[in-house]
Curated annotation (Swiss-Prot):
Domain EF-hand: 1-20, 22-43
Domain of life: Eukaryota
Family: Belongs to the parvalbumin family.
Tissue/organ expression: Detected in muscle and cutaneous mucus. In the skin, detected in cells in the basal region of the glandular epithelium of the dermal mucus glands (at protein level).
Protein name: Parvalbumin beta
Annotated compartments: Cytoplasm; Secreted
Residues that hold Ca(2+) 1 according to the record: D7, D9, S11, F12, E14, E16
An MF annotation (GO) of this entry: metal ion binding
Reported function: In muscle, parvalbumin is thought to be involved in relaxation after contraction. It binds two calcium ions.
Record's keyword terms, sorted: Calcium, Cytoplasm, Metal-binding, Repeat, Secreted
GO CC aspect terms: cytoplasm; extracellular region
Native source species: Rana temporaria
Length: 43
């Protein structure tokens, strides 16, 4: 279930970022920061 939740959240975030028309590099950097923060909260 955790993976399903992560997948849904990631897809939702990607859709939101598309609204801001960010470049691929900016999107990747944003997602990387988000994942690192999420992993820190999980630990």
């Amino acid at each position: 279930k955790v993976f399903e939740i992560l997948d849904m959240d990631r897809s939702f975030i990607e859709e939101e970022l598309k609204l801001f028309a960010l470049s691929s590099a900016e999107t990747a950097a944003f997602l990387k920061i988000g994942v690192e923060e999420f992993q820190a909260l999980v630990k």
